[in-house]
Every structure is written in C-alpha cells, then in structure tokens.
Amino acid sequence: MKAVVFAYHDIGCTGIEALLEAGYEIQAVFTHADDPSENRFFGSVAQLCAEHGLPVYSPEDVNHPLWVEHIKGLAPQALFSFYYRHMLKQEILDIPSAGAFNLHGSLLPAYRGRAPINWCLVNGEQLTGITLHQMTMRPDAGAIVAQQAVAIKWADTALTLHGKVRLAAKALLDAELPKLRTGDISLTPQDESRASYYGRRTPADGELHWDKSARDLYNLVRAVTQPYPGAFSFAGDRKLTVWKATHIAQDSDMLPGTILSQDPLRIACGEGVLEIVAGQAEGGLYVRGAQLARELGLVAGMRLGAKASSALRKERLTRVLILGVNGFIGNHLTERLLKDGRYEIYGLDISASALGRFIDHPHFHFVEGDISIHTEWIEYHIKKCDVILPLVAIATPIEYTRNPLRVFELDFEENLKIVRYCVKYNKRIIFPSTSEVYGMCDDHSFDEDESRLIVGPIHKQRWIYSVSKQLLDRVIWAYGKKEGLNFTLFRPFNWMGPRLDSLDSARIGSSRAITQLILNLVDGTPIQLVDGGAQKRCFTDIEDGIEALFRIIENKGNRCDGQIINIGSPDNEASILQMAEVLLGKFEAHPLRHHFPPFAGFKRVESKSFYGDGYQDVSHRRPSIKNARRLLDWEPTIEMEETIGKTLDFFLQGAVSTGVEHD
C-alpha cells in the first residue's frame, strides 16, 4: 500500500519504522525543520528518512496548492500523521483512497490538542495511552481505529512517560497496520460528551503557585522537568528552577511559599509541603536542594513566589479603553472585566442606557461622547491605557445598503484614526473584525489563516461593511509587521443574547435577526423570513463569546499577539427559519405569553424588498475555531436553544415593564 507520511518527534520515527516493517511503500515524508530554540531530545525524522532512502520535505506551508498537487500526483492510498504539528486541509485529507489517519498521544476523546503527555501529568492522571484515529478538520476528533492504554506511575516524568507511550505506539501500529492494508478495521465514533481539549504549553506555564497543594506542584514539576524548561519560582528577583521534588503530607501553619527548612529544602504549600530534591539557580548548576538553598541564601522563614519586580507591576490594574462601551459586546465585556477585579475600565459611548449597574463602580470610568468628536479625549486615553478595544461600528445589514457612506466613515475612517494612535503610543489593540470579511467564501468552515475572502460586485453595496473591516484588518496586520503594532483581531460569528440591539432599533429595521423576530412576536406581526430563511448561521451565546474575548485580553504567555481568532460555535449551526421556529416555541411557552398578541404566522419576503437594492446574502457562515482552541484553550459550551430562551426572556421582560404589550 502506498502511503504519504507527515511526521516529527520520536513518535514520527516510530511510525515510519512501523510502516516499513508492515510493508508499506512510503512515497514521501513531510516533517519540520528543527527549531534552534527547542531542546531537541527526540529522534530526527529527516535523518531516519535519509538512512532509509525516503524522500523527505519540510515545506513552510504544506497546504499550498503546489504541495497539494504534488501529493495528488503521488496518488497515495493512505496518509498518516505521526506528531506532525500543522493542521492539514480537507483537500489533502481527501486524497488517499483508504483514508487519512493520525496517531495521538492520549486516550481520545480525552486530552485532544497539544502536549497531552505533559497535561496528563499536570492533572495527576493515572492512565493515558495512544490512539489511532481518522483525521478530520476538527483536531483529534475523528473516529477511532484502535487505542492502547499506558499506566502512569507516581514517579513518571514527561520523558519517561513519553518513552512508554512510544512503545505503546509501536505495539499498536504493529497490530493495526496490517489490518489497514486489507481494510479489516472497524471505526468507533468518539463520545463528544467525554471530550476535553488542551492548548499548547509555554515555559511561563511552569511557574509554581504555592497556594496550590504540594501534590499539584509535584505533578507540575514532573510534567515539565528535563528535557522541558522546568518548573520555577523566585526568591525576590532571583529565579530558581525545580528539577526534582517530592510532596509530603504534612500540615503547616505557615503562609504558602514559606521556606520551612534549608536541609532538606522544604516549602509550605496551600496543602502539604513540597521538598525540592534538586534544582538550579539561573546561570548556575544542577544541584541538590540543600546546596541550592545555600547558593541563594535561602533560610527558614523566607518566602518564594512571583518575581518581586513583576509582582509590584501587577499591583496596578490593567487599564482597558473600550470605545462603544454601551454596546452589546462592550457592555457584557465590562461586566466580565470588573468581575475579574484586575482591570480598570475607561469607556466612551453616545449613550449610557445599559450602563447603570456599572456607573458607581470604582474601577469604571465613563464619558458620554462621539468618537468622531471627542478625538482629544480618545488620544489621551489611548496614551494612558494598556489595552484598546474600538468596538464602535455600524453592524446591522440594512444600514449597509441604506447608509453605505456612513458605514464607511464610521467603521473604517474613524477606526483608522484609533489604529494610528495605537501605533503612535505603542499600545496593544484588540480589534473587532467580523465574520462578514469571509463574504461568500466557499469553504465548509472559514479558516482565519487559509480561507479566501470573497465579496460581490461593486453595485452590491451590502459588502461595504465587509470590505471596510477587511481593509482595517490588512492595515493593522501591516502595522504589526512593519512598525511592531501589538494586535489581535477577533471575528465574532453571530453572537446573541440579552441586550442585543433594542426593540426600538428593530422597529426601524436596524437590528440583528433575532431582535427583529422578537419584535414581530411582541407586535403581533408576521415573522418575516428573508428569502425564506434558508441561510445558515452558527449562533454563539454572548457568554461564550465574552469568555473568549476575556482570554484574549488576558493573553497568557502572549499567545494572542499578532493572531486572528474566530469566535463562534460551529455546532450551533441552524437556518434562520430553524432559529425562528425555536424562538416561536419558547415564546408560546413563556409565562409572559398572555401579554402579547396571537402569533401572526411566517411571511416569506424577498431580500430586495426587505433590505433594498444592493443586498446580497450568503448561504452559510461556519467558523473554524482551531485558533481559539489552540491559543485560548476555549470551547463554546452553550446551546442555541438556551441562548434563544435567555434573549427572548430579556426582551419580553423589558416590553412588559415598559408597557409595550397587547391590550
């Protein structure tokens, strides 16, 4: 059987050797060039291929059309991925006649994503393993071919566990590869209810937080000890790395991080005591814990913790400037940031109608104003704040055709000024792009880094919003590349929930779909389905969306710098008609139903009569959320039906309280 292989690491070498032993004809191997900054403790796929005379490549973009055509020309019957670090596009996965298969270092569906061996140890698991599964565009989500379990012992480190998993991988492949050749395999779909996903780890994730239990800290030490960067802490500003430790079930009345003794070097934790068996001062040697204590002058009563200079800096709250703070996203984001307690919010908007619950908060500062007028205030606060979120935009479809020039002036020209202030004062900008930039993209799911951005002809003015946002995306990207602007672009996919628009805005047609439909129910007018409501969207609960946006602001390990991130819920895909039917069902069952007129039915209308000349719609808009999973460790959790119920309840409560009801 002919095979193309994507491989890296020891597991990659193991996979190639297993294929050769099973009689597969390997036509090409794709791997990664070694990263000089990485401590490479594993075998070289490139070297192994050279020894076996296999053609090996390391393209910068294996999904480039030239490489796709090259792989098609090889006509492989099977494709294998063994610890290859890049996602493969569907176009490549569709090439092999017998399928594409990946080897993942966990017992799926648990521990999808990056660094599963390290994460298993961090979480104190007692069992992991290796899984051979079909490849899909969703990472590690395809049907399972076979699994082999590996027991985790208390003394295991990431290195020893990796060795066990490698041996399990060899045994699994030896058993399954002959079956794959003959087609004698059975596939088991993954149980999504048991799925978990973990993102990449960075050296910063190794910091020891002494308020945790000694058991948890021991697990962290063994998860990141050599050859990984190691767990670490600080004595003042002096860094020490803990390479080996043990935990002691001993109570202590000392504050977490307090040194209890020098020899042995023992530290009080939130629960129990951690003994540092071996460690290393920055620039020093690997030594026993007692010697490390002497070298750093550590004595009983001193405390370890965060770097002293960093801790002092962290005492100041992070200042966040939100322009458009009264809007749907700005309002919910303010609530989330203030709840966290580490942020001070400066907000500007033309109204404070939804801000009453924040006005008296000591960390919330609001000015009523227009971004096109209050330019001096904006420039001063951009200079003053740490993170800038310009959320002001016209984002309702009817305005794209009704007021295209106003859309351009506000959404592009005014926001470009803000971008340039951020460049001038070297400030981090988190810019709200939009799912609209993908336009009529024909991909199954829209990928931030790969999908084409396709819009209609010039006379279709509805695209002025999309291209205004897209051009700003490109300008921000260019400023990042050429002038060092620190940015993140996020693209919301049909976020909805309480406070989305208002019934008054819906009355003049200037609202999003669900608000318009709720108005029809409240007023007793027919629900208007533009072009029959067949258009599909992926509806995302505002709570899920805000949690992802909060993590972008938090930016652990600076992972979000220079990134584009879709934020949406692919599993909540439904047509506008389906959404309307769910909404109607919840409306009829609502305790306030008797306040409103009878349901007036559905009415199909043409888009031209509803939106006017220049409108053009798209059939589907489904996000790839691989970047959100990888960078934010985020997954949407709330189903569309729940979101519709919350949104409906908010507007019905408001309508009854203001007297907008049926007599």
UniProtKB/Swiss-Prot annotation:
GO biological process: lipid A biosynthetic process; lipopolysaccharide biosynthetic process; response to antibiotic
Record keywords: Antibiotic resistance, Lipid A biosynthesis, Lipid biosynthesis, Lipid metabolism, Lipopolysaccharide biosynthesis, Multifunctional enzyme, NAD, Oxidoreductase, Transferase
UniProt: UDP-alpha-D-glucuronate binding residues: 395, 400, 434-435, 462, 494, 528-537, 615
Region (Formyltransferase ArnAFT): 1-304
InterPro entries: Arna-like_SDR_e, Bifun_polymyxin_resist_ArnA, Epimerase_deHydtase, Formyl_trans_C, Formyl_transf_N, Formyl_transf_N_sf, Formyl_transferase-like_C_sf, Lipid_A_modif_metabolic_enz
Binding site for NAD(+): D349, D370, I371
Pfam families for this protein: Epimerase (PF01370), Formyl_trans_C (PF02911), Formyl_trans_N (PF00551)
Site residues (Raises pKa of active site His), renumbered to this chain: D140
Site positions for Transition state stabilizer: N102
UniProt pathway annotation: Nucleotide-sugar biosynthesis; UDP-4-deoxy-4-formamido-beta-L-arabinose biosynthesis; UDP-4-deoxy-4-formamido-beta-L-arabinose from UDP-alpha-D-glucuronate: step 1/3; Nucleotide-sugar biosynthesis; UDP-4-deoxy-4-formamido-beta-L-arabinose biosynthesis; UDP-4-deoxy-4-formamido-beta-L-arabinose from UDP-alpha-D-glucuronate: step 3/3; Bacterial outer membrane biogenesis; lipopolysaccharide biosynthesis
Gene Ontology CC annotation, any one: membrane
Region described as Dehydrogenase ArnADH: spans on this chain: 316-663
EC id: 2.1.2.13, 1.1.1.305
Active site: residue positions: H104 (proton donor), E436 (proton acceptor), R621 (proton donor)
Binding residues for (6R)-10-formyltetrahydrofolate: R114, T136, M137, R138, P139, D140
Function summary: Bifunctional enzyme that catalyzes the oxidative decarboxylation of UDP-glucuronic acid (UDP-GlcUA) to UDP-4-keto-arabinose (UDP-Ara4O) and the addition of a formyl group to UDP-4-amino-4-deoxy-L-arabinose (UDP-L-Ara4N) to form UDP-L-4-formamido-arabinose (UDP-L-Ara4FN). The modified arabinose is attached to lipid A and is required for resistance to polymyxin and cationic antimicrobial peptides.
Family listed: In the N-terminal section; belongs to the Fmt family. UDP-L-Ara4N formyltransferase subfamily.
Subunit structure: Homohexamer, formed by a dimer of trimers.
Name of this protein: Bifunctional polymyxin resistance protein ArnA
UniProt organism field: Aeromonas salmonicida (strain A449)
Lineage: Bacteria, Pseudomonadati, Pseudomonadota, Gammaproteobacteria, Aeromonadales
